[in-house]
């Protein structure tokens, strides 16, 4: 498949004057829903990948292969530019290079590489940051692994919540100088924090689920933020829906009394049944059941 168009569309958005909220997606159906509702891009988080693929918490036990395969499934289902959280690149700088190669092949439009020391080491009390020099090496490796120059490489740091504003700025400026296309910050809670960073760096900014006072698109746009996450509520809502439906059925509720379900029309839309009906008529001289 040709992934060029979606990467170009994402770069157009990043170069534009406004911040966007991407839709949080995790599989083919959720990506199609986001696309049908008009989201300009989708976001596939590492935590959600672990939940979806393994049923495991966000403790970095998912492999690159598993992550790339799920990203490909999402990408082939539609045309939504997909941003993905590639965590620490699944190892050292050499692993980062391969991570970029695999995710580019899977069709992603953008990926983040972070400077957190992952997975958590023996005896560690919590996450730590790798040295800036090591982070720069990872960013350079990511750029070296990229074949399609339209693929957006995002340098990410969680320093704001660990070491503060000054270290965040130092790290982001180093990654900017290394040549990444965009800068991602996790843990930003106040406007003062964002203002300080926005004044210190030149590249477009990407925020990961910031504090409540920052959810103002006009303000974010004026601070050169071009992408801002709203958490990953769709997956959480889906888990709750499955839980409550199965709970009701287990308790003896008749299936016909379960009302909060997708309509047949919505199911046909998200499974692209009309496409398959057309292909069945064209290639099989047959009608698709239920069309």
What are these regions (language model features)?
Residues 249-291:
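Flexible C-terminal active-site loop/helix
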Residues 2-232, 236-247, 283-291:
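Alpha/beta enzyme core
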């Amino acid at each position: 498949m040709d992934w060029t168009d979606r990467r170009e569309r994402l770069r157009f958005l990043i170069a534009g004057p406004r911040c966007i909220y991407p839709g949080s997606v995790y599989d083919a159906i959720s990506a199609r829903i986001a696309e049908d509702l008009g989201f300009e891009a989708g976001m596939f988080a590492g935590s959600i990948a672990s939940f979806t693929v393994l049923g495991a918490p966000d403790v970095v036990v998912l492999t690159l292969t598993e992550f790339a395969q799920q990203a490909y499934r999402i990408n082939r289902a539609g045309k939504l530019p997909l941003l993905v959280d590639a965590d620490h690149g699944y190892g050292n700088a050499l692993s980062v290079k391969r991570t970029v190669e695999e995710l580019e092949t899977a069709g992603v439009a953008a990926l983040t590489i972070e400077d957190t020391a992952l997975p958590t080491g023996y005896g560690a009390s919590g996450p730590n940051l790798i040295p800036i020099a090591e982070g720069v090496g990872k960013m350079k490796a990511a750029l070296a692994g990229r074949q399609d120059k339209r693929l957006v490489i995002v340098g990410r740091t969680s320093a704001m919540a660990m070491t503060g504003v000054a270290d965040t700025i130092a790290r982001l400026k180093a990654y900017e100088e290394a040549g990444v296309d965009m800068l991602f910050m996790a843990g930003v809670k106040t406007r003062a924090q964002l203002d300080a960073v926005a004044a210190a760096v030149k590249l477009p900014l990407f925020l990961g689920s910031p504090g409540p006072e920052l959810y103002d698109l006009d303000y974010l746009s004026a601070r050169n933020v071009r992408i801002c996450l709203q958490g990953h509520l769709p997956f959480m809502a889906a888990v709750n829906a499955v839980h409550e439906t199965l709970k009701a059925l287990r308790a003896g509720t008749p299936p016909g009394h379960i009302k909060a379900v997708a309509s047949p029309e919505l199911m046909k839309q998200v499974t692209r049944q009309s496409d398959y009906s057309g292909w069945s008529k064209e290639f099989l001289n047959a009608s698709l059941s239920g069309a």
